């Protein structure tokens, strides 16, 4: 569950900012920002009010995640790497103590740059992942991702879907770890 990585699980007086970007056919969306402020002086805080604030924050996050599953893709394109790289580079320059990116996607890029829906291009990825890596990183460079933890979540529909996801996820993990992110 996403709450396990929350700064609030470590200390209820912490603050937290959560930014959610959807991967779409146009390559960018307006981010959804949710936050809860840190308690400035914990000794003067009200435990009951803080618990209510935290529960409200968690409920707002849960509602956003639940609403994301409602819209079905079925779109012609998906700019997966662009969206992920922009989110990672934003985190790389952030001064937050804890940086996490949660990606819920099949990771199947389908853009003018590359398509994991194309069997020939998927074969190239299997045989020569470094050449595909160079294509993506030339177009969308990544900064040093030290201190960023990335979670890749997807629920495959069948064995074939799972197999393809594993290939693409391994590709992403290779890119992420080469830029010092952890997963």
Regions from the PLM with identified roles:
Residues 1-6, 78-85, 122-136, 164-174:
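Well-ordered, non-membrane alpha-helical segments in soluble/globular domains
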Residues 156-183:
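Von Willebrand factor A/integrin I-like adhesion domains
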Residues 1-96, 99-103:
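Von Willebrand factor
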Residues 14-20, 99-102, 141-156, 182-183:
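Hydrophobic beta-strand segments of well-ordered beta-sheets in folded domains
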Residues 8-12, 89-95, 139-144:
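Surface-exposed acidic, glycine-flexible loop patches that form ligand/cofactor-binding
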Residues 108-165:
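VWA/integrin I-like adhesion module and closely mimicked acidic/polar interface patches used
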């Amino acid at each position: 569950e996403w709450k396990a990585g929350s700064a609030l699980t470590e200390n209820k007086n912490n603050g937290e900012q959560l930014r959610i970007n959807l991967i779409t056919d146009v390559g960018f969306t307006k981010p959804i920002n949710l936050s809860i402020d840190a308690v400035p002086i914990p000794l003067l805080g009200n435990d009951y009010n803080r618990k209510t604030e935290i529960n409200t924050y968690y409920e707002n996050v849960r509602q956003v995640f639940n609403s994301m599953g409602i819209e079905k893709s079925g779109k012609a394109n998906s700019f997966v790497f662009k969206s992920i790289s922009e989110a990672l580079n934003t985190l790389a320059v952030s001064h937050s103590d804890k940086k996490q990116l949660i990606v819920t996607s099949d990771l199947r890029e389908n853009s003018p740059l590359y398509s994991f829906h194309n069997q020939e291009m998927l074969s190239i990825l299997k045989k020569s992942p470094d050449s595909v890596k160079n294509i993506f990183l030339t177009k969308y460079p990544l900064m040093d991702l030290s201190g960023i933890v990335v979670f890749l979540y997807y629920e495959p529909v069948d064995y074939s879907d799972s197999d393809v996801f594993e290939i693409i996820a391994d590709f992403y993990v290779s890119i992420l770890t080469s830029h010092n992110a952890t997963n």
